[in-house]
From Swiss-Prot:
InterPro entries: Aminotransferase_I/II_large, HisP_aminotrans, HistidinolP_aminotransfase, PyrdxlP-dep_Trfase, PyrdxlP-dep_Trfase_major, PyrdxlP-dep_Trfase_small. Gene3D superfamilies: Aspartate Aminotransferase, domain 1 (3.90.1150.10), Type I PLP-dependent aspartate aminotransferase-like (Major domain) (3.40.640.10). Belongs to the class-II pyridoxal-phosphate-dependent aminotransferase family. Histidinol-phosphate aminotransferase subfamily. This is Histidinol-phosphate aminotransferase. Transmembrane segments: none annotated.
Length: 370
């Protein structure tokens, strides 16, 4: 009855919601700190909340399927024409569009060894072979080597570059990304995932990707962005892709109608306008990131310098699954990375008081179990 390809797919395990912790552990919602899904700990712009309240009565209407207002606002924000933009229910959906639309006959896709899990899921659903870099140590060099070796064996239909990379947090320089795109064949689509780009660009200008420059220089690249992270709209599910007019037109052929809701489009439109809120969130993230790095050094954790709104801790003497379960029982949701084959855990950078509590809990765990 079902496709054989589904047997190869491990169901994606999303970050645990607060409601699940309430049900399983009987902890009051107000006593739970959720730092496992890289949501914006500062919530949503007050302007967005006000707009949603004013427009809630429109929930019965189908959305404007042209997404005219948001597409034009994004076009203005990135200084491109609206014909270069496609909007999806999260940037995940645009990844799905890419995998559905590409010609994968006798082809494969390339991705990093440790990266966003949905790349692999959507590639497998498309029935395409996957090749990964052997490690995460020298990622650009490994991508070059992997591309050169694999293209002799089988056509490469797409390459995923996550910048910054989730769940590790490292980020390629924008110039290095362009260097790689320049080197690949023109019939290979390079998918540049910038879900956390706002944080990276603030921390290091060399990491700042310019989508306009990318699509002007290259006809085989698509840049992905999202409103789920710094814009605080994870629950609204809005993402976007910026690419050549030809790529966008092909993706529209697999896009279902009304794929983003009326209220989600309205929320994203207002969120994009409130750049004061965005700037404050980015600055606060940088301040709190420094606290996490200092804490890691104090406790002897190895950490991966992060350009996102999260940090990944490695500790050879701690079993990450045991630690994450203990933290969960004490009302703290973080992301165990055992499913990636790593003895590591990822923590979203929260508000100051949340982070203080994180430090207290981890210290308490170490005192009990060391």
């Amino acid at each position: 009855m079902f496709r054989s390809a589904l047997k190869q797919i491990v169901t994606y395990e999303a970050g645990k919601p607060i409601e699940l912790v309430v049900r399983e552990y009987g902890i009051k919602p107000e006593d739970i700190i959720k730092l496992g899904s890289n949501e914006n700990p500062y919530g949503t712009s007050a302007q967005v909340v006000e707009s949603l309240q004013k427009n809630a009565h429109k929930a019965f209407l189908y959305p404007d399927d042209s997404m005219y207002e948001l597409k034009n606002a994004l076009a203005s924000h990135f200084d491109v024409e609206s014909k270069h933009i496609i909007i999806g229910a999260g940037s995940d959906q645009i990844i799905e569009f890419c995998m559905q639309a590409l010609n994968h006959h006798n082809a494969q896709v390339l991705m990093a060894k440790t990266t966003f899990a949905m790349y692999e899921v959507y590639a497998k659903l498309a029935g395409v072979e996957i090749s990964k870099t052997p490690s995460d140590e020298h990622i650009l060099e490994e991508f070059f080597q992997l591309y050169q070796s694999e293209k002799e064996r089988k056509h490469i239909s797409a390459v995923f570059l996550c910048a910054p990379n989730n769940p590790l947090g490292e980020c390629l320089d924008a110039a290095a990304i362009e260097q790689f795109i320049q080197a690949v064949d023109k019939d290979t689509l390079v998918i540049v995932d910038g879900a956390y780009q706002e944080f990276a660009a603030y921390k290091d200008k060399a990491k700042a990707i310019n989508p306009k420059q990318l699509i002007e220089r290259f006809s085989n690249v698509i840049y992905l962005g999202t409103f789920s992270k710094v814009y605080g709209l994870g629950g609204m599910r809005v993402g976007y892709g910026i690419a050549s007019e030809h790529i966008i037109s092909m993706l529209y052929k697999v896009r279902p109608p009304f794929n983003v809701t009326t209220l989600s489009l309205q929320a994203a439109l207002i969120a994009l306008k409130d750049q004061v809120f965005v700037s404050e969130c980015i600055k606060n993230n940088a301040i709190e990131m420094a606290r996490y790095e200092a804490f890691a050094n104090e406790m002897g954790f190895t950490f991966i310098p992060s350009y996102g709104n999260f940090i990944t801790f490695l500790h050879s003497h701690i079993e990450s699954s045991h630690l994450c379960d203990w933290l969960l029982q004490n009302g703290l949701i973080v992301r165990n990375l055992r499913s990636y084959g790593l003895n590591a855990f990822r923590i979203t950078i929260g508000r100051a008081e949340q982070n203080t509590r994180v430090f207290e809990l981890i210290k308490a765990y170490l005192q009990i179990h060391n």
